[in-house]
């Protein structure tokens, strides 16, 4: 007789972690004191500054170069970073680094400058490294097929943010665009974590309203996604909730009176960095996956792209019985709706049930977006309807393959990502019964989209 023996894998509980830069300096005017360490503690001699042309031409690098001159540290500046940094510009900067041979790299700017500088750092220290290997997706950052090269053997990395949003100054991530394919790749490894972050709001005071708004809402999505992510812990939860409380209170002030309201700027800078530390360890989700591709295909600022997708993702993730969960979560049953309700509670938004609290959270986020001038839909930003629909399938596929998708608490189907994009374009919100999305051809109007969905829903019930 044959014995039918079935084997079931038992999941092991992995060690958790919390990683952050070795040194984080915070306070308006702290830059000169922080940079003192380069000479007095580390004995550094050559610094390479990475920034964009706007910041360079408007004197943002001067406080840094003045301090370096005072300490006798030789320096040069690369200022050709684009708003969406490309692999080509990173290679150009790395070539200049190789010629200059710095022992210190100082990234000054928003996420674009800091991300580009991280890629330059890798290419400078390890020119043999293969970019596509580094961009390879993984399930667990601690158990990768590809081992990231050891960083810091040639240069010490310092990040100085000039806006309150990306959190790149404290994260192990860098987003770079392959200019040949147009694909935006998020790289992730703790070797990319800066050695020092300097959060000096002297660099934030003159940020324009549009940047303040987009960056601030970006920080909101960082904190919300980190709180609901599969790798969230007690350590990241506190940072995420504190960041959200601070942003909801101070972002409108920073937006309206940013050039004079020092307290609002400082609070926002700290909140963005705290949200960065939260998602550096808990990771993000499908909102960022879709925002990466929406920005790459239609040239929307990253924070705006996140703002346009966040409501759809909140509704999608809140399903109590999802068809497919994310992989290797730190919990044993779906509880994302309850997590969103906890965020609503920490913001004192009210509600008697978790469902009511979710609606109040969505309403509060939408009200915050309205206060800082964020529009309601993708279409409102002038994205041509035919161009959007023509690119929709490719954008959907790339979002599905994005590294951030793997940490989302609910694993999406491509059809679900596609419908969320359509909802965000037309301002029609996610309804569970309307999944999966039906194929839509040509230049259609919102009513036609609704008719196709309703027809599909009826046929599914039949």
Where are each of the predicted segments found?
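ATP/NTP phosphate-donor binding region
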Residues: 15-104, 378-379
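C-terminal segments
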Residues: 1-14
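Short, amphipathic C-terminal "tail helix"
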Residues: 387-462
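Glycine/threonine-rich beta-strand-loop-alpha-helix active-site module
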Residues: 88-202
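Short glycine/serine/threonine-rich phosphate/pyrophosphate-binding segments
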Residues: 31-34, 57-60, 87, 112-117, ...
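Carboxylate- and glycine-rich phosphate/diphosphate-binding segment that chelates Mg2+/Mn2+
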Residues: 170-282
């Amino acid at each position: 007789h044959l014995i039918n023996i079935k084997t079931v894998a038992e999941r092991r509980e992995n060690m958790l972690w919390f990683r952050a830069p070795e040194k984080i300096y915070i306070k308006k005017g702290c830059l000169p004191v922080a940079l003192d360490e380069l000479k007095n503690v580390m004995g550094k001699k050559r610094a390479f500054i990475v920034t964009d042309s706007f910041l360079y031409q408007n004197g943002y690098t001067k406080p840094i170069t003045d301090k370096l001159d005072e300490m006798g540290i030789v320096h040069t500046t690369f200022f050709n970073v684009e708003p969406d940094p490309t692999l080509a510009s990173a290679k150009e900067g790395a070539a200049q680094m190789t010629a200059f041979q710095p022992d210190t790299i100082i990234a000054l700017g928003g996420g674009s400058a800091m991300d580009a500088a991280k890629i330059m750092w890798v290419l400078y220290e390890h020119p043999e490294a293969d970019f596509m290997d580094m961009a390879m997706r993984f399930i667990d950052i601690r158990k990768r097929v590809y081992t990231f090269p050891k960083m810091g053997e040639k240069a010490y990395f310092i990040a100085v943010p000039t806006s309150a949003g990306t959190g790149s100054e404290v994260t192990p991530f860098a987003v770079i665009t392959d200019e040949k394919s147009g694909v935006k790749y998020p790289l992730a490894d703790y070797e990319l974590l800066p050695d020092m972050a300097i959060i000096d709001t002297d660099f934030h005071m003159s940020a324009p309203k549009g940047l303040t708004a987009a960056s601030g809402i970006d920080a909101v999505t960082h904190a919300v996604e980190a709180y609901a992510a599969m790798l969230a812990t007690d350590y990241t939860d506190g940072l995420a909730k504190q960041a959200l409380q601070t942003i909801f209170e101070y972002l409108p002030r920073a937006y309206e009176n940013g050039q004079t309201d020092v307290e609002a700027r400082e609070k926002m800078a700290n909140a963005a960095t705290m949200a960065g530390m939260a998602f550096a360890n808990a990771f993000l989700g499908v909102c960022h996956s879709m925002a990466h591709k929406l920005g790459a295909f239609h040239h929307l600022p990253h924070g705006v792209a996140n703002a346009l997708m966040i409501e759809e993702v909140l509704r999608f993730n809140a399903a109590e019985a999802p068809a497919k969960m994310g992989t290797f979560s730190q919990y044993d049953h779906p509880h994302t709706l309850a997590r969103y309700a906890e965020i609503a509670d920490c913001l004192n938004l009210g509600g008697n049930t978790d469902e009511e609290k979710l609606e109040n959270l969505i309403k509060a986020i939408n009200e915050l977006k309205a206060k800082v001038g964020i529009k309601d839909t993708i279409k409102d930003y002038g994205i041509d309807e035919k161009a959007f629909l023509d690119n929709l399938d490719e954008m959907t596929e790339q979002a599905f393959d994005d590294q951030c998708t793997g940490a989302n608490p609910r694993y999406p189907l491509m059809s679900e990502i596609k419908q969320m994009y359509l909802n965000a374009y037309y301002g029609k919100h996610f309804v569970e019964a309307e999944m999966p999305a039906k194929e839509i051809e040509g230049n259609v109007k919102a009513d036609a989209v609704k008719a196709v969905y309703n027809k599909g829903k009826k046929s599914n019930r039949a």
